[in-house]
Amino acid sequence: MQNCAFTGSNPTIAINAGFSVQWLGHASFKINTSNGQQFLFDPVSDDFDWPVNWAFSLVSDISRTPNATLTQSELNETDAIMYSHIHYDHFKKDDLSHIGQNSEFLTPLGFAEHFPNNGYKITEMAWYSSKQVGEVNVHFVPANHFSSRIMVPFIHEDHDATLWGGWVLEHQGKKLFFAGDTGYSPHFKDIANKYGNMDVCLIPIASYHSEEHPKWYRKVHTTPEDALIAAADLNCKVMIPWGYGNSSWQMGDKTSHSALFRLMHMYKKMSSNIPLHVLNEGESVKL
């Protein structure tokens, strides 16, 4: 089951948070605030960087449907780009030349060495650190995941050489949370205890399925039911799921939308009261 689309209805959610959210596919989001600022989370266009895209094509028949992309003028209007971690489906080095150097780049610790050495404005951040970008306070928060980018057996590997995490955008007392890749852990409650209730939560629901290593996959990727529990821990006023879909490489899932089907099933089974807003790639919502 591929090339699907969500055709259901979303509830009317009037929370006046002042955020406009566009899902570009997989983990990529464009966020606009009520004062006209613009932010990007994990922008990745097309397929992985070389040589991983080439290697992936050799061992898998799964390809990515081209995701929604931004125009050059939209990229030029971006105040800051935030990356959650260094994995190929969240950071594409080849995209940097298209994004340009007008924006600030906020990254986890150890990330800057993966950028070209020619003028990019990069701020590396530790967990629970903050940076003011215009009128928006940006917080880097923990996630239960890992990092790696390069592995040549017996020669080089960079496992956990860079940090990983999620992000909180805070503007005029309203907060938007982007989880990054993560498994479920007490860190969600820790984030709520430090920053308060979240208005908008962007939480992954996919990449948890593995026949060979089911326990490990779930440790580092939330299932749909884990995501609902995390949203409750954060006291989210609305949750937007991501990670499934036509532009998500079907990684760790049986079909492109199996995670969304599971979310809908578990939402009813768990009697969750977290408001959901489901987007298709390219769609946006004002909250």
Task: Identify the residue ranges that each predicted region occupies.
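Short, polar loop motifs at secondary-structure junctions
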Residues: 25-26, 107-114, 126-128
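Active-site neighborhood of phospho(di)ester-bond hydrolases with catalytic His/Asp-centered motifs
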Residues: 40-42, 63, 77-86, 106-108, ...
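Active-site environment of divalent metal-dependent phosphoester hydrolases
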Residues: 46-48, 86-91, 112-115, 129-132, ...
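Cap/insert and terminal regions of metallo-dependent hydrolase folds
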Residues: 110, 175, 183-280
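Conserved beta-strand hairpin/beta-sheet module of binuclear metal-dependent hydrolase folds
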Residues: 14-70, 160-180
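Active-site regions of enzymes building and remodeling cell-envelope glycoconjugates
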Residues: 118-125, 137-138
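Pre-active-site segment of Zn-dependent metallo-hydrolases
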Residues: 7-12, 36-82, 93-98, 148-152, ...
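Active-site-proximal loop/helix segment associated with metal-binding centers of metalloenzymes
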Residues: 46-53, 140-173, 186, 195, ...
